[in-house]
A protein has these predicted regions:
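Bacterial N-terminal signal peptides
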Residues: 1-10
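Gly/Ser/Thr/Pro-rich low-complexity, intrinsically disordered segments
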Residues: 12-370
Length: 370
């Protein structure tokens, strides 16, 4: 009788899980913890093994004529698995609230909140990123841009890439310098050699192909003596503190694990403490101390008797102390980031939604996905 009680106690505290191998180095865990109760869905990725097998992490953006949203299941169609990403910002158009990089191209600039990024070699990094964007002219002058994919003020220089036309159909600026890439594609922590094809003035339709950029200068920004048609200029985009060439990134916030310690950084990232302390469905991403094991996590919530959701403290505790109970690599998360949650929380495996989204209408359209 004593042995039976001990075994039952372990089952109640530890919970149980179902496991499915999706690809070399990629495993899906469906975890049930009774003390919540919680249903937790985890994609565990052994990055070296998965990378060697050709598996890659990609971001996808919701599309429409003016920015837009799509369901995670649509964004992740054809992928091994996917989770929803960043918060949605809505004004005249809808778009991701923070940083997004896709296939080495910048889509949205970093904000005050943390973001997750990964290099071409599969090295992950969670940080609050800064942006340094501009061109180096043929004469050696560094023309630093003040903005990205938006209209410049009178004293500004702004860079547009081909993603700008998702939100804009025209450009209004004193001058615009059309750049054609000659060598290289990614501009994240790298430079691309380009040639100035033409100069435009005042207002014109915006149409850029991948590999083309536009420098738009305000009326009081004098770049005419530095750039001329036919010049070769180097376009750069740096995202400190990252040093590697980052190929994919998605925003979120707040950071909840820093160097193995629980660190719920809501005040630092100017987010709501109430949002952190209440139980909600949660989406998160984290990785191990050696940077070789990645975790994509969705916690169901707002469903009494099924799964009640987690506070950010509870989410961080699970990632820091309990993931290893289920992980094939026996690893916990050492760094962790909260992503958009609530009704947005969705995990897709093999084109099927595997969690239980909390909205009465089912899966919610989102700004982007991993």
């Amino acid at each position: 009788a004593l042995l039976f009680c001990l075994v039952l106690l372990v089952a109640c505290v530890s919970g149980d899980s179902n496991v499915e191998q999706l690809a070399p180095g990629v495993v899906y865990h469906k975890i049930h913890l009774l003390e919540g109760p919680w249903w937790i869905h985890v994609i565990e990725v052994d990055l070296p093994e998965a990378w060697a097998a050709g598996v890659r992490l990609r971001t996808a953006m919701g599309h429409s004529e003016r920015g837009g949203v799509q369901k995670t299941s649509s964004l992740a169609a054809g992928a091994l698995a996917g989770i929803n990403g960043d918060y949605l910002y809505t004004s005249k158009t809808s778009h991701t609230a923070g940083l997004q990089i896709a296939a080495g191209s910048l889509i949205r600039t970093p904000q005050r909140q943390s973001a997750f990024a990964i290099s071409g070699a599969g090295k992950p990094l969670i940080a609050v990123y800064q942006m340094e964007l501009g061109v180096l002219t043929a004469g050696g002058e560094d023309l630093r841009a003040q903005g990205f994919n938006r209209e410049p003020s009178s004293k500004e220089l702004v860079v547009y890439n081909h993603y700008a036309q998702v939100w804009h159909d025209s450009v209004h600026a004193a001058r615009g310098f059309l750049l054609q890439g000659l060598h290289g594609e990614s501009t994240i922590n790298d430079t691309v050699i380009t040639r100035v094809q033409q100069v435009r003035r005042r207002a014109w339709p915006l149409f850029l192909e991948p590999g083309q950029w536009l420098l738009a200068a305000g009326a009081e920004y004098d770049a005419s003596s530095s750039i001329a048609p036919g010049d070769t200029v180097r376009l750069y985009c740096r995202l400190p503190p990252a040093h590697d060439k980052m190929v994919e990134a998605v925003g979120g916030g707040p950071r909840i694990l820093r160097d193995g310690a629980i660190s719920i950084e809501v005040e630092k990232e100017r987010l709501s403490r109430t949002f952190a302390d209440e139980r909600h469905p949660r989406t998160a991403i984290g990785y191990s101390q050696n940077g070789q094991v990645l975790f994509l996590i969705a916690v169901d919530g707002r469903q009494p008797g099924h799964s009640v959701g987690m506070s950010l403290q509870e989410l961080a505790e699970f990632m820091r102390m309990r993931l290893a109970d289920f992980s094939f690599a026996k690893e916990n998360a050492y760094q962790g980031l909260n992503l958009d949650g609530g009704g947005s929380t969705t995990m897709v495996v093999g084109d099927q939604v595997v969690n239980s989204p909390s909205d009465p209408t089912g899966e919610r359209p989102v700004a982007n996905a991993l």
